[in-house]
Amino acid sequence: MIEADRLIQPQLQGQDDVIDRAMRPKLLDEYTGQDDTRAQLKVFIQAAKNREEALDHMLIYGPPGLGKTTLAMIVANEMGVNIKSTSGPVLEKAGDLAALLTNLEAGDVLFIDEIHRLSPVVEEILYPAMEDYQLDIMIGEGPAARSIKLDLPPFTLVGATTRAGALTSPLRARFGIPLRLEFYNVKDLSTIVTRSAQVMGLAIDSEGATEIAKRSRGTPRIANRLLRRVRDYAEVQHDGAVTQNVAELALNLLDVDGEGFDYMDRKLLLAIIDKFMGGPVGLDNLAAAIGEERETIEDVLEPFLIQQGFIQRTPRGRIATARAYVHFGMIKPE
């Protein structure tokens, strides 16, 4: 598996979570990008505050690293309530979820990351909690077992997932506010890089921030990670300030090219072009050709390449587009 080794992977790695927490915006007005989502949230939050009600349950979905956890924390801050965070795989038993729910206060936010990985038993407990603010608990065992209902204070469940399609229909239907996060444009990412540099006390000019943004694959988490590595380079090889030239030299040294591709991205594209004459090629053959698991190709490598128009996924297999050929200085055969 390659995820642990890639500087440009969108999933959390190493100290990302600790460092990202210091750079996270706290309020919607500080949040950059996702304009439609931000506009919707402003309306929903203000309406809930005017009615003095808990915000409706919210599902935030999209590729990793785009700010789902950050948005959940912003929602809690804007509503002026507490937030309790957990993740789907951690909630193994119904009692795990019950313990969290019974400790919530009125209006609090319960954030469940990777909510698509909830076990069926835990999910069943969640339904009445979301719909009626009630908790069904079984007391005793065998013939003497009986069910009791506990009333819960009104709360907001914020679920986050990279795979909205993996949620069961009953669970998905209980979220009143679905929000999809999209990849960021270079302008918004550049603003994020500049803000993060200020938090770090790092001198950076607009061209340097833009250069990092262009190679960040539309993902703030990657942008912040690259910024930290560029800072290391600037401090050791230059005077500590990040300019476009310093950013280019640092990112080239890190093997992250102008499109944000690393060695594995280029290896995948060149395999389709050179070994399979541009495609179409099936996923199993492609996985064997580059020595990777098919799941890694599908979940880690492909999404960004498809989104940027370098690969087409067809019923017959993967095809390298004309843009992929141009990236390597080639012309696609007719």
Curated annotation (Swiss-Prot):
Self-association and partners: Homohexamer. Forms an RuvA(8)-RuvB(12)-Holliday junction (HJ) complex. HJ DNA is sandwiched between 2 RuvA tetramers; dsDNA enters through RuvA and exits via RuvB. An RuvB hexamer assembles on each DNA strand where it exits the tetramer. Each RuvB hexamer is contacted by two RuvA subunits (via domain III) on 2 adjacent RuvB subunits; this complex drives branch migration. In the full resolvosome a probable DNA-RuvA(4)-RuvB(12)-RuvC(2) complex forms which resolves the HJ.
UniProt-annotated location(s): Cytoplasm
Catalysed reaction, written as an equation: ATP + H2O = ADP + phosphate + H(+)
Binding-site positions, Mg(2+): 69
Top EC group: hydrolase
Gene Ontology CC terms, in alphabetical order: cytoplasm; Holliday junction resolvase complex
Main subcellular location: cytoplasm
Family, similarity comment: Belongs to the RuvB family.
Region ranges (Head domain (RuvB-H)): 258-334
The protein's role, per its UniProt record: The RuvA-RuvB-RuvC complex processes Holliday junction (HJ) DNA during genetic recombination and DNA repair, while the RuvA-RuvB complex plays an important role in the rescue of blocked DNA replication forks via replication fork reversal (RFR). RuvA specifically binds to HJ cruciform DNA, conferring on it an open structure. The RuvB hexamer acts as an ATP-dependent pump, pulling dsDNA into and through the RuvAB complex. RuvB forms 2 homohexamers on either side of HJ DNA bound by 1 or 2 RuvA tetramers; 4 subunits per hexamer contact DNA at a time.
Binding site for ATP: 24, 65, 68-70, 131-133, 174, 184, 221
Disulfide bonds: none
Positions of region (Small ATPAse domain (RuvB-S)): 185-255
EC number: 3.6.4.-
Residue ranges, annotated region (Large ATPase domain (RuvB-L)): 4-184
Entry comment, domain topic: Has 3 domains, the large (RuvB-L) and small ATPase (RuvB-S) domains and the C-terminal head (RuvB-H) domain. The head domain binds DNA, while the ATPase domains jointly bind ATP, ADP or are empty depending on the state of the subunit in the translocation cycle. During a single DNA translocation step the structure of each domain remains the same, but their relative positions change.
Name assigned to this protein: Holliday junction branch migration complex subunit RuvB
Protein residues bound to DNA: 294, 313, 318
Keywords: ATP-binding, Cytoplasm, DNA damage, DNA recombination, DNA repair, DNA-binding, Hydrolase, Nucleotide-binding
NCBIfam families: PRK00080.1, ruvB
Gene Ontology terms, MF aspect: ATP binding; ATP hydrolysis activity; four-way junction DNA binding; four-way junction helicase activity
Pfam family, one: AAA_lid_4
Example GO BP: DNA repair
